[in-house]
From Swiss-Prot:
This is Large ribosomal subunit protein uL14. The keyword Metal-binding does not apply. HAMAP family: Ribosomal_uL14. The gene is rpl14. Binds to 23S rRNA. Forms part of two intersubunit bridges in the 70S ribosome.
Length: 132
């Protein structure tokens, strides 16, 4: 995992429902904790593109449902600015399930992956079909 330079627009607060964009068996997950969150007192933690977080599986196969898993955000609906000045926004909020060390649990990713997530997580970039 590499660091991200500059400030990041975090568009997914606690409790956000996120589409799972891989083939692990989870379809919908709910954000319950953001890893490495250092925020202000009483501020609700939020995750942005490339952040690792803990989630609860809400919809999916019976084996996956109600499990607590780690995931990385690969798309977010809230617009964010890149260093070259362009604004990026996706159609949905999506994440892929990973192990605590950052290894991807699935073998394929559906839909595009944000460049910020691909640069930070090389294992995600390796199996991504489209990087935007």
């Amino acid at each position: 995992m590499k660091g991200i330079a500059g400030r990041q627009t975090r568009g997914l607060p606690l409790g956000a429902n996120i589409t799972c964009a891989d083939n692990t068996g989870a379809r919908s997950i709910s954000l319950i904790d953001v890893k490495a969150w250092h925020g202000k007192a009483r501020r609700i933690p939020a995750a942005g593109v490339g952040d690792m977080f803990m989630a609860s599986v809400k919809k999916g196969t019976p084996e996956m449902r109600s499990k607590v898993v780690y995931a990385v955000v690969i798309r977010q609906k809230r617009p964010y600015r890149r260093p070259d000045g362009t604004m990026v926004q996706f159609e949905d909020n999506a994440a892929v399930l990973v192990t605590p060390d950052g290894e991807v649990r699935g073998s394929e990713i559906k839909g595009p992956v944000a460049r910020e997530a691909a640069e930070r997580w090389p294992r995600i970039a390796a199996i991504a079909s489209i990087i935007v």
